[in-house]
């Protein structure tokens, strides 16, 4: 059966892994997923990620981050879904928790956080929000 929302699946794996206090989780690899993980790592929400080719298909091993036993990611949600795409200009990008969280945006300049997109004055598809 085909997966309709691969990015949503990865975010759910991260959420479930942190609830289960896992050190790392595996997710099938794709360029979009790797770019989103790059933003999460840059912003300090995960320790890192690496490509894991031990199985039949390429996968991404996501190293989850905890602070004093609590997950670094309190909330992660998909915003733009396959059934309803959400786009935003650079000036209308949503802020998460008054700037305490980030919005991940797919722009013509790549996948960026909301702050980076505002700085570069580009808008795009609002992929997810994290705090």
From Swiss-Prot:
Give the InterPro entries listed for this entry. Answer: Ribosomal_uS8 (IPR000630), Ribosomal_uS8_CS (IPR047863), Ribosomal_uS8_sf (IPR035987)
The processes (GO biological process) annotated in the record are:
translation
Q: List the disulfide bonds.
A: none
Pfam families listed in its UniProt record:
Ribosomal_S8
Q: Which GO terms describe its molecular function?
A: rRNA binding; structural constituent of ribosome
Which Gene3D superfamilies does the entry link to?
3.30.1370.30, 3.30.1490.10
Sorted keywords for this record are: Ribonucleoprotein, Ribosomal protein, RNA-binding, rRNA-binding
Top-rank taxon, per record: Bacteria
For the keyword rRNA-binding, the answer is yes
Q: Which GO terms describe its cellular component?
A: ribonucleoprotein complex; ribosome
Return the similarity comment.
Belongs to the universal ribosomal protein uS8 family.
On subunit structure and binding partners, the annotation says: Part of the 30S ribosomal subunit. Contacts proteins S5 and S12.
Which NCBIfam families does UniProt cross-reference here?
PRK00136.1
Function of the protein: One of the primary rRNA binding proteins, it binds directly to 16S rRNA central domain where it helps coordinate assembly of the platform of the 30S subunit.
Q: What is this protein called?
A: Small ribosomal subunit protein uS8
Lineage at the top is: Bacteria, Pseudomonadati, Pseudomonadota, Alphaproteobacteria, Sphingomonadales
């Amino acid at each position: 059966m085909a997966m309709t929302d691969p990015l949503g699946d990865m975010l759910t794996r991260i959420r479930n892994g942190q609830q289960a206090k896992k050190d790392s989780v595996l997710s099938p690899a794709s360029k979009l997923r790797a770019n989103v993980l790059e933003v999460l790592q840059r912003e300090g929400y995960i320790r890192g990620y690496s490509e894991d080719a031990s199985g039949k298909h390429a996968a991404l091993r996501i190293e989850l981050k905890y602070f004093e036993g609590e997950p670094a990611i309190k909330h992660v949600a998909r915003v733009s879904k396959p059934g309803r795409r959400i786009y935003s200009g650079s000036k209308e990008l949503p802020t998460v928790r008054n700037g305490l969280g980030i919005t991940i945006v797919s722009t013509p300049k790549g996948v960026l956080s909301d702050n980076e997109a505002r700085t570069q004055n580009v808008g795009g598809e609002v992929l997810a929000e994290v705090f």
